[in-house]
Amino acid sequence: MIWTVYLSGEIHTDWRQQIIRGTEALGLPVTFSSAVTHHEASDAAGDMLGEEVAGFWRDHKSAKVNAIRTKSLLENCDIAVVRFGDKYKQWNAAFDAGYCAASGKPYITLHDEQIIHPLKEVDGSAMAWAQTPDQVVEILQYVTASG
């Protein structure tokens, strides 16, 4: 079985690449998907539907267009990894974790110890909490093992 892993959350560090490189080095049977990680492109996803004067409606259109991708990829993944960084509030990541929890999709949270308290409910529904991308790779190695 090839596992599909959805990588959600923080876009300002290379955690995604670290996980991908780690799984490739081990030859794990996984493929990856993700939301659009280019911030400006994501913010402008709804611009093709017409110009908006109010920022709310531009954001609303872009959120809807982005949700086409996100919802489809989350529904089709086997497991999600949801990364919370310490610099920005990742509302999208929290939403993805909630979606996974509500739909019974297993997910791993990835974040530093300093933000355990604000994420206690998110972590409470997660199958695992990792502090490093290497720990995520170790979990993926274990769960994808054929023996």
Could you describe each region identified by the protein language model?
Residues M1-G147:
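Conserved catalytic or regulatory cores that recognize and/or transform ribose-phosphate-containing ligands
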